[in-house]
From Swiss-Prot:
HAMAP family hit by this protein: ArgB
GO cellular component terms, A-Z: cytoplasm
Cell location: Cytoplasm
Coiled-coil ranges per UniProt: none
Signal peptide from the UniProt entry: none
Protein name: Acetylglutamate kinase
The enzyme's E.C. designation: 2.7.2.8
Pathway recorded for this protein: Amino-acid biosynthesis; L-arginine biosynthesis; N(2)-acetyl-L-ornithine from L-glutamate: step 2/4
Catalytic reaction list: N-acetyl-L-glutamate + ATP = N-acetyl-L-glutamyl 5-phosphate + ADP
Keywords of this entry: Amino-acid biosynthesis, Arginine biosynthesis, ATP-binding, Cytoplasm, Kinase, Nucleotide-binding, Transferase
Organism: Dehalococcoides mccartyi (strain CBDB1)
Superkingdom: Bacteria
Gene that this sequence comes from: argB
Length: 272
């Protein structure tokens, strides 16, 4: 990955749910990125762990357009698992590799402020504002931020409503990358690349083409928030990519060699 002299060297990385798997190499790649002088900012999800604990507690998992309906009881599980268990497992793994890391959530220092999307999906929300003060302070102290997408419910909050929100980690990653004007936004997923209308893998797409994939319905499911977040980041001057995190060392390969999945830029389309 080439850095310009004006680069802030910030790379925002959205970690998929496999990062705690002993065979996953993504966290090991973080150590290499630090050695290369980059400043990784990690955002994680943990939907499968939330679902597993919900089942243990006898709570039904309900999804609308692939996102979790978040009632009071589910919000408790989301906050405990994402801002607690999953976040601290990742931080502990990084510390074990000699990387100074700190786990925070969107609530801390009002890093992510949001509002409820719709009454029928409960405390499922959308990002309204990003405050980068805490993230920047950690980076300046050479500490890697590990961010849970549990966020602060302040905007248009009804009287008596909860102060926490469950926000999808994909848009959180895009908004943070945009606010930080990061050099790169990387999504580690369980697919090799974004697919075109004929099912072909797309190696590089322009922002306009990404928007067409969304508007036409070619992009579906979990790819929708990822592509939207890539568009958000490119508008702020970042480049963005979606790569297969299941393959060993794909993160470091993408950032040093490139061409590992789908890159969203303002340039011409290249198919792989």
């Amino acid at each position: 990955m080439e850095m310009t002299q004006s680069s802030n060297h910030i790379v925002v990385i959205k970690l998929g749910g496999s990062v705690l798997d002993s065979k996953d190499t993504s966290l090991k790649d973080i150590a290499t990125l630090k050695q290369l002088g980059l400043k990784p900012v990690l955002i994680h999800g943990g939907a499968s762990t939330v679902s597993a604990w919900s089942a243990k507690l006898g709570l039904e998992t309900r999804l609308v357009n692939g996102e979790r309906v978040t009632d009071d009881a589910t919000l408790d599980v989301v906050a405990a698992i994402l801002a607690g268990l999953v976040n601290k497992e990742i931080v502990a793994a990084l510390l074990d590799m000699g990387i100074k890391a700190a786990g925070i959530s969107g609530v801390d220092s009002a890093t992510i402020t949001g509002q409820i999307r719709a009454t029928e999906t409960g405390y499922l929300g959308d990002v309204v504002q990003v405050n980068t003060e805490l993230i920047t302070a950690l980076l300046d102290a050479n500490i890697t931020p590990v961010i849970s997408p549990v966020s602060f419910h302040q905007i248009n909050r009804p009287s008596g409503s909860r102060r926490l929100l469950n926000i999808n980690g994909d848009p959180v990653a895009g908004e943070i990358a945009s606010a930080l004007q990061a050099e790169r936004l990387v999504f580690l997923t369980d697919v090799p690349a974004v697919k075109g209308k004929n099912g072909e893998a797309l190696g590089e797409i322009s922002a306009d083409h990404a928007a067409e994939l969304l508007a036409s319905g070619t992009a579906s499911g979990g790819m929708i928030p990822k592509l939207r977040s890539c568009l958000k980041a490119t508008l702020a001057g970042s480049s963005a990519c979606i790569i297969d995190g299941r393959k060993p060392h794909m993160l470091i390969r993408e950032l040093t060699e490139g061409n590992c999945g789908t890159t969203v830029t303002g340039q011409h389309l290249r198919r792989s």
